[in-house]
Amino acid sequence: TTERAKIAPILTSEQAFDDQTFAKPQEARVTHLDLDLVMDFDAKSIGGTAILDVLATEGANEIVLDSNGLRISAVTDEAGNALEFNLGETVEGKGEPLTIQLPAQKLERPAGLAEGELAATHRIAVEYLSAPEAEALQWLSPEQTAGGEHPFLFSQGQAINNRTWIPTQDSPGIRQTWEATVSAPEPLNVVMSGVVQGDPEAVDGNRRDFRFEMNHPVPPYLIAIAAGNIEFRE
């Protein structure tokens, strides 16, 4: 028998190029995304913090993410220290490059990794808010739903629309694992394209937190969310 080859994401190859992303994955790429978000139906926005694990090459001092209409309020390192960032000019149909200075301090290499196995070198946190006109998010009023009592939200990230509500490297070749905690007003339920982690947890302000996890690296456009008067049946 032959050992099954490990296939790396296409954009780790120098020959591959995606002209619909601002990212430079040969220098620094996102490997994991941890979202802590609050859903606001009145403002038609999702906002909070995206914590990104980054694998950077030796000598790389910045990472470029994709954004489209995101309102970036702060970027910090793991210790909460501010990091320099710049939101570039908008390119029609593509959005803006979000360039972030990487922390000087690198993450410790986890114990038990095999020789040659790669691990994240940096961790950064981006505080942000999506715009009401975010193309990936469809906000429906109660009158637009079958029940007529509660609003409804669903996302459509393909092909490059998730950058309108998630600051990451929005390219199908830059696959990422992810996890998310999403706060929504009662009695709405939240679903995502990941594995549910426990029951919803009640929090202040008549809201509940929902948790999800995806341990298999996926293209960013496959991160999906919906919320509304959703029922679960066996």
Q: Model-predicted segments: where are they?
A:
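Acidic/His-enriched low-complexity segments
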Residues: 1-234
